[in-house]
Every structure is written in C-alpha cells, then in structure tokens.
Amino acid sequence: MTPLDVMWVGLGGGVGSLGRWWIGRIVGEYHHGAFPLGTFLINISGAFVIGYLSVLFGVDWHDRYGTMLNAGVLTGILGGYTTFSSMQLDAVKLSHKGQGGLAVFYLVASVLSGLFAAWLDAMLAHLQG
C-alpha cells in the first residue's frame, strides 16, 4: 500500500459517502414509511454497480486492492456509498419499534437483493465483454 493508494481510497470514500447522504435525503423526502427504503436502494444499487465494475476492471479477488481504480472506485467510492452498518442500525430501530418482522424481512431482502444485483450485473458485464 502506498500513500497514493490511501489518498485514492480516502477521496473515493468521501465522494461515495456524499452520494449516499444525498440520495438518502432525496429518498427520505418522498418516502415516509417504516421500511428504510433509502438505505435499501443505496446498498442494492451499489451491489449492482460493483458487480459490473469488478468484471470490467478484471478484479482478482486475491488482490482486489492493488490498483488505483480498485482502490479509488471499488473500495473508496462504492465502499463509502454502500453501508452495512446503517442497514444493521435500521433493523435495530425497526425491532425497537415493535416491527421485528419487518426488520428481519429488511435484512433478508437486503442481502438477497444485493447478491442478486451483483450477480446480475456481473453476468451482464460478461455478456458485453
């Protein structure tokens, strides 16, 4: 790891975090239900994009942090954009509000939808490539 790698991850993380904040606010202005739609859409769209880009960049999962593109885009931007911790917090908040069933649904739907989105876009990238 070089200082330049650290810079790319940090800059990308800042960009991704700002994107997450901005999209979360926009979704929150229109969606007022109990389901944490903003975090859900952010994580699924991030999984979709990372599936495609990992194929496009030819990511070797044994050394996925090795290039500037991987460090800046995959780890930085998409790592800052998606949020596992917010997903967990949303589920805890739902549980504390007596909506345990919705919390479980949210977690399962998030994981399965994210896996499907990443797989689908990786397959699309392979078809194009």
Curated annotation (Swiss-Prot):
- Organism domain of life: Bacteria
List the keywords (alphabetical): Cell inner membrane, Cell membrane, Ion channel, Ion transport, Membrane, Metal-binding, Sodium, Transmembrane, Transmembrane helix, Transport
Q: What is its main location?
A: membrane
Instruction: List the membrane topology term(s).
Output: Multi-pass membrane protein
Q: Pfam families under this entry? A: CRCB (PF02537)
Keyword presence, Cell membrane: yes
Q: Where does Na(+) bind?
A: G79, T82
Q: PANTHER family recorded for this chain?
A: FLUORIDE EXPORT PROTEIN 1-RELATED, FLUORIDE-SPECIFIC ION CHANNEL FLUC
**What name does this protein carry?**
Fluoride-specific ion channel FluC 2
Gene symbol here is: fluC2
